[in-house]
Amino acid sequence: MQAIVYFITLLLPAFLVAQIDLPPASPDAAWTHQVGFTQIELSYSRPHMRNRKIFGALVPYDVLWRTGAGESTRIKFSEDIVFGGKLVKKGQYGLYSIPGKEEWIIILNQDATLHGDFGYDEKKDVLRVKVKPTNSPTTNESFTIELTDFKPDYSASLEMKWENTSIKVPIMSTADDRIMAQIQENLIVKKVENAGLLNKGAQYYFFNKKDLNQALEWSITSETLSVDNINYSVLTANILERLKRYPEAIESAQKALELARKKDMTDDVKNLEEKIKDLKIKKSK
């Protein structure tokens, strides 16, 4: 008996060591991006094609899908956001979908704790949006979710790609509401005379195609409060150019050019000289 015990004791370490570790078939993935003031966090699993037909086969059409593998896909917004054209409150959600040949349904569900779609309750859906799939020019071996199409208006797209299919859901931050409220309070109601604030307001109106005449007023005032800031004069010139007031735009650009020469800003001098040439051409037409 003692011999048997001794023999088993000798074999036990070998059994404990004898193992083969393989990476998961559907590795985890996670990312965090910022759109406007909103932090977007997403975690999901990335299954692979492995020479299989995906949509309409492995992932059937018109059936709820966990939008990944393993645990349910989770998405979290730090602030309210417009998702697929609909306002969504800040918080964490389960991201589900119903793939279709001609149309997909993208779902945000209150329950982000499920394993896949087991226990999914449609009554907990906070949003359903319909999107059209498009053909991807390249084959995507592994399922991928990423943010794409970032734009200056604080918008982007949540894109899902697998096989030769791409799905995009438009996302837009509510940053504009907050910024416009701050501009309203500080520059319109209180009429704060601060060069930096006035320039920011003018920039925001200019780049987001709002009231250009108001932007011009703020930009000119910022110049009078900070006479040696080249960026303020450049912005004034850009606003005047968009308003097609070319003679005045040339004057503002000339002012910026003089400041650039005075400060030995070689690159700015070159750029402004080119800009003035371009403005003179536009003026002559």
Language-model-detected regions and their locations in the chain:
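Bacterial Sec-dependent N-terminal signal peptides
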Residues: 1-22
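Short N-terminal segments immediately surrounding and downstream of signal-peptide cleavage
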Residues: 20-36
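Extended, well-structured beta-strand/loop surface patches
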Residues: 22, 39-90, 97-189, 193
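Alpha-helical adaptor scaffolds
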Residues: 183-240, 244-248, 258-259
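Boundary/linker segments of alpha-helical solenoid repeat arrays
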Residues: 229-231, 260-272
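Alpha-helical linker/edge segments of TPR/alpha-solenoid repeat scaffolds
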Residues: 242-252, 262, 275-285
